[in-house]
């Protein structure tokens, strides 16, 4: 996968040299290319922003540098057509399903906005040549798109073949399609079996794989109900077995996933 990142702070992305993502880059599994937006500015101060039309606080990123940057980066016709990602708090919520979908793309470009955002005409113009998506990592505002881009790139990259040492871990992640769809992962434990008087649940030491799978499913349901009841309401009732319904009833939820009346 090729990933181009356009930003006024290329150094923000040094974490992509670390851990499994850095190893994947060095082995050629991921081709990450950083671009300083100011390279496409020509005044003495390398200006990338200006005052907003219509008035109001803050500054807006100018369209000219963005247009030239995207033109030059996408000029490599042999690389195919990229998908442009605009991280913004006004975008669609980024989910694990989006990570799975985007991990199948051969080429992604991330445009990291700053200030009040990027002139809206940039996305309109780019959409004439490539798919464009606005994505949000949460209902809060950051100083720019760099942090969101790091989040999305890591979520996508870890799904690529060869990046993780154990591919089974992906299927057991929170929100993973299949048995973990719309569920968060339950508690995890490692050695020693007793630490400061706290014991690992005996079932995990039993070697009974079917029982362990059932325990993990139960704990995922309990933790999701406690921390993310909104996800429980999204569960397909047809996907719930008898034990699932019993667990939901234990934590105060009916089979229909609606809260039980007091």
Swiss-Prot record:
GO terms for cellular component: cytosol. GO terms for biological process: tRNA N1-guanine methylation. S-adenosyl-L-methionine binds at residues 113, 137-142. Homodimer. PANTHER family: TRNA (GUANINE-N(1)-)-METHYLTRANSFERASE (PTHR46417:SF1). HAMAP family: TrmD. This is tRNA (guanine-N(1)-)-methyltransferase. It comes from Thermobifida fusca (strain YX).
